Regions:
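A detector of repeated loop/turn-to-beta-strand junctions in beta-rich toroidal repeat architectures
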Residues: 16, 56, 72, 115-118, ...
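Conserved beta-strand position repeated across blades of beta-propeller domains
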Residues: 1-2, 45, 94, 145, ...
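Hydrophobic beta-strand segments that make up the repeating blades of beta-propeller
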Residues: 1, 8-11, 50-53, 101-103, ...
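Predominantly a core beta-strand signature of beta-propeller blades
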Residues: 28-32, 68, 73-79, 118, ...
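Surface loop/turn motifs at the tips and blade-to-blade linkers of beta-strand repeat domains
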Residues: 32-37, 78-85, 133-138, 212-214, ...
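Beta-propeller domain segments
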Residues: 6, 90, 107-111, 119, ...
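Blade-loop segments of beta-propeller domains
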Residues: 14, 18-50
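Asp-box/WD-like beta-propeller blade repeats and closely related beta-sheet repeat scaffolds
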Residues: 40, 45, 57-96, 104-107, ...
């Protein structure tokens, strides 16, 4: 999800290959389809009146989109230097405080030896087309945001499946310096060398996660809370959408979690919104979160096909 300057909420639907605009009309909300037939349009970002959509093979731009919701313009290709892949081939992306576009490129496998262009987060200068790698060893990130005070990049990452997956957590990570390596495929969770792919590497060579989120919770979208609607103690907290496990007998995730920080240290990690699962049955999967101008928190759910709004009763 991404927010337009006029309050339009843009939503990418990866499986449907569509991008939607949700418009608040006061007494009702209207949904318009502004693009279809796209390849995995998971990444959505808005800047200077334009909507940017990340497909598997390219990033496209829809200019002046909020004035043209009834007839979206023909998109312009702004970046296409992306590797071909069919595994983890969605491109989460967002504009950073420096004005550059950051794009996550997952590993082309559950776990494998990697070519240099995979398992990373890139910083792209759209004016020149040049990019630099700001984080390596990132298996499958589908959510990141910048700390509102330090401007450091924080991101979620999904750990490997199968094998000893119960020992491999999803992670919350912080990029303290460009080019840091976060372990994949050699080390998981900061302290578990991969039995097959560690290649004699020590976990001490890599950046350990700031927080282990739990195995197979499918930690996806995340945002720092910068609104003023929630009580003051929520400002600067992190909200993380956990879509939930898919290959475990004992299911995990299916919640939006709250992370309370003191500096860069986690003080609390606790459920914020639950109720998508009961007794091993689930009826929803939270995917992304978005802080609205009024301070409310939106939560997208790709199983129920819904967007929920969390606010505070006055």
């Amino acid at each position: 999800m991404a927010l337009g300057s006029r309050g339009t909420v843009f939503v990418g639907s990866r499986v449907a290959g569509k991008v939607y605009a949700v418009i608040d009309r006061g007494d009702r909300r209207e949904v318009k389809t502004i693009a279809s037939g796209l390849q995995q349009p998971n990444g959505i970002a808005f800047r200077d009146g334009a909507l940017y959509v990340g497909e598997t093979h390219r990033v496209i731009r829809f200019d002046q989109i909020e004035s043209r919701l009834d007839a979206a313009p023909v998109p312009v290709v702004v970046y296409s230097d992306l590797p071909a892949q069919t595994h983890h081939h969605w491109r989460y992306m967002a504009f950073g405080p420096d004005g550059a576009l950051y794009i996550a490129i997952g590993a082309p496998c559950n776990i494998c030896t990697l070519a240099a262009e995979y398992a990373q987060i890139r910083r792209v200068d759209l004016a020149t087309g040049r990019h630099e790698v700001v984080a390596r060893g990132v298996r499958n990130s589908i959510g990141f945001d910048w700390h509102p005070l330090t401007r450091e990049l924080w991101f979620t990452d999904n750990g490997r499946d199968w094998g000893e997956a119960d020992r491999v957590p999803d992670e919350l990570n912080r990029v303290a310096a460009p080019g840091q390596h976060f372990g994949f495929p050699y080390c998981h969770g900061g302290d578990f060398p991969d039995p097959e792919f560690s290649a004699g590497r020590s976990c001490a060579e890599f950046v350990a996660p700031t927080l282990k989120l739990g195995p197979n919770v499918a930690a996806l979208g995340m945002r720092f809370y910068t609104g003023s609607l929630f009580p003051a103690e929520y400002r600067g907290n992190l909200f993380i959408a956990q879509r939930g496990s898919w290959n475990r007998e004992l299911k995990t995730g299916f919640a939006v979690m709250r992370v309370t920080l003191k500096g860069n240290v986690v003080e609390r990690y606790e459920p914020f919104v639950t109720g998508w699962m009961n007794e091993e049955r689930f009826w929803g999967r939270p995917v992304d979160v978005l802080v609205m101008p009024d301070g409310a928190l939106l939560i997208s759910d790709d199983h129920a096909g819904a967007i929920f709004r969390v606010s505070v009763a006055r």
